[in-house]
Regions:
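Core segments of cupin and vicinal oxygen chelate
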Residues: 35, 42-87
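N-terminal beta-strand motif that seeds the catalytic metal site of vicinal oxygen chelate
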Residues: 3-7, 16-49, 155-161
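Short beta->alpha transition motifs characteristic of CBS
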Residues: 65, 84-87, 132, 151-159
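Vicinal oxygen chelate
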Residues: 46-49, 87-88, 95-149
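Short hydrophobic/aromatic beta-strand element in the GNAT-like acyltransferase core
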Residues: 71, 80, 92, 139-141
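Residue-level recognition of conserved beta-strand positions in structured domain cores
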Residues: 76, 85, 95-97, 154
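Structural preference for beta-strand elements that scaffold enzyme active sites
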Residues: 40, 92-94
Length: 161
């Protein structure tokens, strides 16, 4: 633990030096960061009732879904977890552009197709990709270097610009 603490302290001590020299901090301010939207984790579960009972012990509350269809979404504060039985093979990290943590539609946000174009320009491959010719709800998926799936799933109309 001491070495971890030293590592964090060394990192934190380095930050002002980079900012003062105009290095990484200056470059980061030149481009607006992507706003990926509301984040949740979608878990592939073997027994949805057992998983639901477990997460309820952690004070998660069901906020969406249909238990009879074997999928529910639970929330505790800003943490949101989807439980899905038999719907997909692996766990998925999900970003919902245009949604707040309470599934309220944001007035201004980055459309899923805008996020897709940015990621494509950075060399990331989509599988599947969102149709660039459409507006409104759409999704695309990517995988990180370890094969973890990230889903960008927009449920709301595109922002008016």
């Amino acid at each position: 633990m001491k070495s971890f603490t030293r590592m964090v302290a060394s990192f934190l001590a380095f930050i002002p030096i980079v900012g003062a020299s105009g290095g990484a901090a200056a470059q980061a301010s030149e481009t607006k960061p992507m706003d990926l939207g509301n984040f949740s984790v979608s878990l592939n579960v073997k027994d949805i009732l057992a998983s639901k009972a477990f997460y309820e012990k952690l004070d998660f509350k069901v906020v969406a879904g249909k238990l009879e269809q074997k999928w529910i979404v639970l929330q505790n504060g800003n943490a949101r977890i989807g439980l899905f039985q038999g719907m997909f093979d692996k766990n998925i990290m999900t970003f919902n552009p245009g949604w707040t943590k309470d599934k309220e539609t944001m007035k201004d946000f980055q459309d899923v197709r805008e996020l897709q174009r940015t990621l494509k320009s950075r060399g990331i491959t989509m599988a599947p990709a969102a149709d660039e010719k459409t507006e409104g709800p759409a999704f695309f998926m990517i995988a990180d270097p370890d094969g973890n799936t990230l889903l960008f799933d927009q449920h709301v109309p595109s922002p008016k610009r």
